[in-house]
Regions:
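Cofactor-binding active-site loop characterized by glycine-rich and histidine/acidic residues
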Residues: 9-21, 25-42, 48-179, 200
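Short glycine-/polar-rich loops that comprise or flank the Walker A/P-loop
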Residues: 153, 180-184, 215
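Conserved acidic/glycine
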Residues: 1-60, 163, 167-168, 185, ...
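Short internal beta-strands
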Residues: 71-75, 183-191
Length: 388
């Protein structure tokens, strides 16, 4: 199993919160399917890999970016991540964490009417969650112009890359009035997997051109700090071009390789392969494995830098490169979309994250660094829950 911990070099304590969010979202789904009595033996629900690809993005938003007037539409399969964050913020009672997809319990898709914790937009059918904040922005502008007091704030959509196959998405993007809505920010979870396959020909550059042509600001978060550092070394330019030119299935296969296998496969057979070989042969095994996974959508600093570039005079799309299942033993596997961790894999993950499977719902100490960060946004969060 090759699953280095996420953001090993990220500043504490935000990285600890990120790890805890990954654990909580995974544990909720594990409990619903493997712990709670289930006479039928059928899968109850939940998508651990889809949650994992969103953990860094949502951690960086909730614990460093969002303000009280902001609203967020969360991609449907990332609902357990939202529940985990709300739990850490004190907005969800522990008793609900064992109720995912139970009658009267937590929903597997965010629901304003059924979930007990704060949800800005109900999402479910693909495409709806992406576009709903556009209509929310229009409604807020109308209320403010007519009655006043509607407040201000950005409208974020967290979008799975496969949702961009939906025609309704592009109907909204191309609407001329949307180009004037600077409060709209979409963050695309570009993990290049759809259902149980690796999408072979997904072209991020084409998506960038389509958004740009509609008048949107396009920000691409492709690589994390480790890879960016390696690119500055001898052989780094060749490594960068090799990764950029690599077909999606080949890249996904590298995620399931040992360090020695990565050293063998990664250089390829181009003229500058020897330069790549020399570069990665100087790295220890842990660094080799971390480097091949070091995409921008899992780098908290890279995401923070992207948010700082948002232009509030026009809509923005942030295309964040991610790995489906990042941090899990199943990361990058082409059939991990609806798969569940085995009990053994779950215990391995617990050990990697420093968690006790017998006490899965532990919060941070209130007076510790991570606990204080969780408490800081709470007053603003309570205010936004009751505002328009």
């Amino acid at each position: 199993v090759n699953s280095p911990s996420i953001n090993q070099n990220a500043p504490e304590p935000l990285a600890e919160i990120e790890k805890r969010v990954l654990w909580l979202s995974t544990a909720m789904i594990h409990h619903a399917n493997r712990v709670r009595p289930n006479p039928s033996g059928l899968k109850v629900g939940g998508h651990q890999a889809s949650c994992a690809s969103m953990v860094s993005i949502m951690t960086s938003l909730w614990f460093g970016q969002l303000r009280s007037g902001d609203r967020v539409s969360v991609k449907p399969h990332a609902a357990p991540v939202l529940h985990g964050i709300n739990y850490l913020l004190g907005e969800l009672d522990e008793s609900y964490l064992t109720t995912l997809r139970e009658f009267g319990g937590l929903q597997s898709y965010p629901s304003r009417s059924k979930d007990p914790d704060p949800v800005d937009y109900s999402t479910g059918s693909v495409g709806i969650g992406a576009t709903t904040p556009i209509w929310g922005a229009i409604a807020r502008r109308y209320v403010d112009a007519s009655l006043g007091g509607a407040g201000t704030g950005r409208q974020y959509s967290l979008v799975g890359d496969a949702e961009l196959d939906e025609g309704a998405v592009w109907e909204a993007v191309l609407d001329h009035s949307v180009a004037e809505q600077g409060e709209i920010v979409w963050i695309v979870d570009l993990n290049r997997q759809s259902l149980d396959r690796v999408v072979p020909n997904i072209a991020a550059t084409r998506l960038e051109r389509m958004f740009s042509g509609a008048g949107w600001q396009v920000i691409t978060v492709k690589f994390g700090a480790l890879l960016e550092s390696l690119f500055t070394r001898p052989g780094g330019t060749a490594l960068r071009e090799r990764i950029l030119d690599m077909p999606n299935p080949e890249y996904q296969r590298l995620l399931r390789c040992t360090a020695d296998e990565v050293r063998l496969r990664l250089p390829g057979d181009a003229a500058d392969a020897d330069a790549i070989t020399s570069l990665i042969n100087d790295l220890d095994d842990a660094t080799v494995l971390e480097a091949i996974r070091n995409l921008g959508g899992h780098d908290l600093d890279a995401l923070r830098e992207a948010y700082a570039q948002i232009d509030d005079t026009r809509p923005t799309v942030i295309i964040a490169y991610t790995i489906k299942g990042r941090g899990l033993p199943t990361q990058g596997h082409p059939q991990n979309h609806s798969s569940l961790l085995t009990t053994e894999q779950y215990e391995i993950l617990a050990a990697e994250l420093g968690m006790d499977p017998s006490k899965p719902w532990e919060r941070f100490e209130a007076d510790g660094p991570s606990g204080r960060i969780c408490a800081e946004p709470l007053s603003a969060w309570l205010a936004r829950r009751w505002s328009i």
